[in-house]
């Protein structure tokens, strides 16, 4: 991809893991991820954060090789290439989201739905307000995109934490 991804959000099955055993599973998964990434050119950090596992690229890396390595880890069911941006307020976030959509989907006609989650509750807008506002910003800037909240081609995820994570 042309876009510069700095991280990967790792999704894993949580169905059978509740309570005390969950951290054992997560720690084993983190160890396994670290192990497969040793074979990949590049430096990575693997971090558990509030029920998520992130793989951060700390150097240049081979995108395809990294994805292939992560696919070999048992227990992972999703690998989301993620753009991580500093939280510099709504205006900057909006610019980043619009740039992301333009880069990822060029001029292809697509329907989309925004999915904003705020782990950082101190953020001045609610998730609902951000969904509406960011969706409007994308519509204004990307004439090829249309909203479809029921069956969108694309879900554009924005997670507001200490930093902001964009993926789709």
Residue ranges of model-derived segments:
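RNA-binding accessory domains that recognize and position tRNA/RNA substrates
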Residues: 2-168
